[in-house]
């Protein structure tokens, strides 16, 4: 039995190696220039005309666009965001306008970080921003969004606004007192996941009516930093944090039909080659190519899941954060490892255009923002990266 297990593991490793990534300039993947500013923890979306918009995060209030249909593709700066610098916003095009939801930032240099519940929209034809007369039902940071149709977007996940804000208020109050600061940090992280009350309500925002609707709840725990993807009427929510420092490998899937979500059976992301367990990912890239759902990059804390299972609630204490370079694909209903990125990256912007997925910016293994734009595509069952 032991020999069979060893042989089985060897075979799985060989299969994974056979699916190794191909770095190509064959024309199946598009080369785009770097963003003018390094970008991590920002946001972005693509309109129906093939124009990508990205901004915020480490770029401050800056926004840029690039037209994929032009022969000479260059980034152009658009009007700066009026709502102040912020990170972890999400954005989507509705009715031809770019909507930006929530995020986390400071009202002033002296103020602590806080979660936002506001909404802004950008009108490309006028190059203007406008604050929408609405607020989200809950504060939105660490949330995710998908476009359901031209007027409606689905938003779910995210941290608990009150718990998150209180942590940064306490950190600010402890300035200059290392002992008190360490106590605040320990008390914040040393709790079970259920005590963080991450959002599990699914909201539908209707841009035409400027209304919010409760579409039910996730079939499991609420998460923050999950990846999301939508193709036709199939929704997928991939991994994320259960609490700060602790990821989940669970993948939620649902069908959107007749203005209703029907949840399907959960699945799990498999371990990467050479590893026994999958910690789960936060800040990963995702998108579809030739019908294959791809997810790559992100970050986790190897060993945190086992610590939590063993009863250590401050599960990532003393563990170095690891940025990932693995790419997984959902092929014929099964998740599998399909290759590696050129470098470990997470917390960038992923945009789908046809069969290509553009990974814009991100955070490298040193925690620094990057300005690169990477293109993913599946071709003849192989992962191509430009």
Swiss-Prot record:
Major place of residence: periplasm
Compartments in which it is found: Periplasm
Disulfide bond annotation, renumbered to this chain: none
Kelch repeats: from-to residues: 51-95, 97-149, 151-186, 187-232, 235-284, 306-355, 357-386
Keywords: Carbohydrate metabolism, Isomerase, Kelch repeat, Periplasm, Repeat, Signal
InterPro entries associated with the record: Kelch-typ_b-propeller, Kelch_domain_containing_8, NANM, NanM_proteobact
GO cellular component, one term: periplasmic space
Top-level taxon of the source organism: Bacteria
PANTHER family listed in its UniProt record: RING-TYPE DOMAIN-CONTAINING PROTEIN
Database matches in NCBIfam families: muta_rot_YjhT, PRK14131.1
Function: Converts alpha-N-acetylneuranimic acid (Neu5Ac) to the beta-anomer, accelerating the equilibrium between the alpha- and beta-anomers. Probably facilitates sialidase-negative bacteria to compete successfully for limited amounts of extracellular Neu5Ac, which is likely taken up in the beta-anomer. In addition, the rapid removal of sialic acid from solution might be advantageous to the bacterium to damp down host responses.
Stated family: Belongs to the NanM family.
Quaternary structure and interacting proteins, as annotated: Homodimer.
Protein name per Swiss-Prot or TrEMBL: N-acetylneuraminate epimerase
Source species of the chain: Salmonella arizonae (strain ATCC BAA-731 / CDC346-86 / RSK2980)
């Amino acid at each position: 039995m032991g020999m069979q297990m060893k042989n089985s593991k060897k075979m799985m490793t060989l299969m994974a190696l056979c699916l190794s990534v191909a770095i190509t300039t064959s024309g199946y993947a598009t080369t785009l220039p770097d963003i003018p500013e390094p970008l991590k923890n920002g946001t972005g979306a693509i309109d129906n005309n093939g124009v990508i918009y990205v901004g915020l995060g480490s770029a401050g209030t800056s926004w840029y666009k690039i037209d994929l249909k032009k022969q000479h593709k260059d980034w152009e700066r658009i009007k700066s965001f009026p709502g102040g610098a912020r990170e972890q916003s999400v954005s989507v095009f509705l009715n031809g306008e770019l909507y930006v939801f929530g995020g986390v930032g400071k009202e002033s240099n002296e103020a602590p970080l806080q979660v936002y519940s506001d909404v802004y929209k950008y009108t490309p034809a006028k190059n203007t921003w406008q604050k929408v007369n609405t607020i989200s039902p809950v504060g939105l940071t660490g949330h995710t969004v998908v476009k359901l149709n031209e007027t409606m977007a689905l938003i779910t996940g995210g941290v608990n606004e009150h718990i998150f804000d209180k942590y940064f208020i306490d950190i600010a109050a402890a300035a200059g007192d290392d002992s008190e600061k360490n106590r605040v940090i320990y008390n914040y992280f040393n709790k079970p996941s259920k005590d963080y009350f991450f959002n599990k309500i699914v909201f539908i925002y209707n841009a035409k009516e400027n209304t919010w609707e409760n579409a039910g709840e996730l079939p499991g725990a609420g998460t923050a930093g999950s990846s999301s993807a939508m193709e036709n009427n199939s929704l997928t929510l991939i991994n994320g944090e259960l609490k700060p420092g602790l990821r989940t490998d669970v993948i939620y899937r649902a069908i959107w039909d007749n203005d209703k979500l029907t949840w399907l059976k959960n699945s799990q992301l498999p371990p990467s080659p050479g590893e026994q367990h999958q910690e789960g990912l936060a800040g990963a890239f995702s998108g579809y190519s030739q019908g294959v759902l791809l997810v790559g990059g992100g970050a986790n804390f190897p060993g945190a899941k086992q610590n939590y299972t063993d009863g250590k609630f401050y599960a990532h204490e003393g563990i170095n954060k690891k940025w990932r370079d693995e790419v997984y694909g959902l092929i014929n209903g099964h998740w599998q490892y399909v290759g590696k990125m050129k470098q470990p990256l997470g917390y960038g912007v992923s945009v789908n255009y046809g069969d290509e997925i553009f990974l814009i910016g991100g955070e490298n293994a040193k925690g620094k923002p990057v300005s690169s734009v990477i293109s993913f595509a599946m071709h003849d069952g192989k992962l191509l990266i430009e």
